[in-house]
Swiss-Prot record:
Cytoplasmic side stretches: 1-46, 123-126, 179-197, 259-276, 340-341, 400-415
A GO biological process held by the record: phosphoenolpyruvate-dependent sugar phosphotransferase system
An annotated GO cellular component: plasma membrane
Claim: Ribosomal protein is one of the keywords in the record: no
PTS EIIC type-2 domain location: 35-410
Compartments in which it is found: Cell inner membrane
Pfam families in the record: PTS_EIIC (PF02378)
Protein name, entry field: Fructose-like permease IIC component 1
InterPro entries on file: Bacterial_PTS_Sugar_Transport, PTS_EIIC, PTS_EIIC_2
Function: The phosphoenolpyruvate-dependent sugar phosphotransferase system (PTS), a major carbohydrate active -transport system, catalyzes the phosphorylation of incoming sugar substrates concomitant with their translocation across the cell membrane.
Transmembrane segments: 47-67, 102-122, 127-147, 158-178, 198-218, 238-258, 277-297, 319-339, 342-362, 379-399
Periplasmic side: 68-101, 148-157, 219-237, 298-318, 363-378
Membrane topology value: Multi-pass membrane protein
Length: 415
């Protein structure tokens, strides 16, 4: 029996050639399938900016508060104006101020860079400016214009920034809008430069301005403001709930989109001095340390090796990278056996981070691992939280792998 082929509907393409129209269901699947790739494109371009800003900021804090022994409650500018520093120490303090200012600027560009490259991934280079503008407005929103009937005067007020939520929404919408306009707006060849350098940028910029002012900033700001209000009102219980949530979101995908979103939330709260970044910083290092530790203790606890041969050297590498603030060293373990690795390091990260916060460890500086440890309040408790989380992770993953091995559900290519 012959198999009949359903012919595709044909419509004129943008260049006049025939183009096949895809099945609507396929297009829908394609959208949701490609969206994570666009988001990861933005994240991958944003990470170097975060690293540069974080390391330079770390230098400024180490110089001022560890080397020059400035009290934690005194800012670098106040220390400069105190008149207590001269000569080489004064030069160091000036460099610390420069590093702090420059690092802060780099951090400020992280979200605009993210939004720009998400839009660029969706709509091409024509969407890059719209994404960047939207990302910038998500961190530095336009002032709100309000009329005060008591004084019969117009005045401005500052809205709550939509931050990562706003940047994510506007980058996706702007990217697809520019892509659609580029396909639908057809002009003669001699007007191509006008279209790409003037028409599309102006239309997309106006759209971003209106969308951010009237929709996205109010929506994202309402969410961010609500979260802050609830956590602040809840006091210590709110801080512990926040620590648990941030630790879980930080650990779950080991540097992926959820991790980065949690980072933006934590950094915004830390920058505004609402809540410290303690739980996130601890949760970054617990998974790789814990999984690396599991490769060391498995044979001592069970009498057999429970990991494949290639994971043993990777475990040591993961532990080393953890001290640099890099959690991606744990990814091979999560890929090899997600059912044993992910629950283990999630539990370890949540317990270790929450315990450290509950016992009084405080970190306001938005970096992780050795770059920030000299600036942590109650460092002993902080390190105990890391150790607790790592031990829980290691014991849990060894126990789960042993159970699966005994049930014949885990094949091990041992040394």
């Amino acid at each position: 029996m012959a198999i009949k082929k359903r012919s595709a509907t044909v419509v004129p393409g943008a260049s006049g050639a025939a183009a096949a129209v895809k099945n609507p269901q396929a297009s829908k699947t394609s959208f949701w399938g490609e969206l994570p790739q666009h988001v990861m494109s933005g994240i991958s371009r944003m990470v170097p900016t975060l690293i540069m800003g974080g390391v330079i900021l770390a230098f400024s804090q180490l110089i001022a508060y560890s080397w020059l022994k400035i009290p934690a409650e005194i800012g670098i500018m106040d220390a400069l104006n105190s008149g207590k520093f001269s000569g080489f120490d004064l030069s160091l303090l000036k460099f610390a101020w420069l590093s702090q200012s420059f690092g802060g600027v780099l951090f400020g560009f992280a979200i605009p860079m993210f939004a720009a490259f998400v839009a660029n991934s969706i709509g091409g280079k024509l969407a890059f400016p719209a994404g960047f503008i939207g990302g910038l407005m998500s961190t530095q929103p336009t002032q709100l214009l309000n009329f005060d009937p008591s004084t019969m005067q117009w005045a401005t007020s500052s809205p709550v920034p939509s931050t990562f939520i706003g940047a994510l929404i506007i980058s996706i919408v702007a990217g697809y809008l520019v892509k659609w306009m580029n396909q639908k707006i057809q002009l003669p060849d001699f007007l191509l430069a006008f279209k790409t350098t003037f028409l599309l940028p102006i239309l997309s910029a106006i759209f971003v301005m209106l969308a951010m002012y009237y929709v996205i900033t109010p929506f994202g700001g309402w969410i961010n403001g609500g979260i802050r209000t609830v956590l602040t009102a809840a006091g210590e219980k709110g801080a512990l709930m926040y620590a648990m949530g941030i630790a879980a979101a930080t650990a779950i995908d080991l540097g992926g989109p959820i991790n980065k979103a949690a980072g933006f939330v934590a950094f915004s709260f830390t920058t505004d001095h609402v809540l410290p970044v303690t739980a996130r910083s601890i949760a970054i290092v617990i998974p790789p340390i814990g999984l690396g530790l599991a490769t060391i203790i498995d044979r001592r606890l069970t009498g057999k090796r429970l990991f494949n041969a290639q994971l043993y050297p990777q475990g040591k590498t993961a532990m080393f990278l953890a001290f640099m603030g890099i959690s991606e060293g744990a990814i091979p373990f999560a890929l090899e056996s997600p059912i044993t690795a992910i629950p283990s390091y999630m539990v370890g990260a949540i317990v270790g981070s929450t315990a450290a916060v509950w016992l009084g460890a405080v970190q306001w500086f938005p970096e992780s691992a050795i770059w920030a440890w000299p600036l942590v309040t109650n460092l002993g408790v902080y390190m105990a939280g890391i150790a607790l989380g790592a031990v829980i992770t290691a014991l849990m993953v060894v126990f789960l792998r042993l159970m699966m091995f005994r049930k014949g559900k885990l094949l091990i290519d041992s040394l």
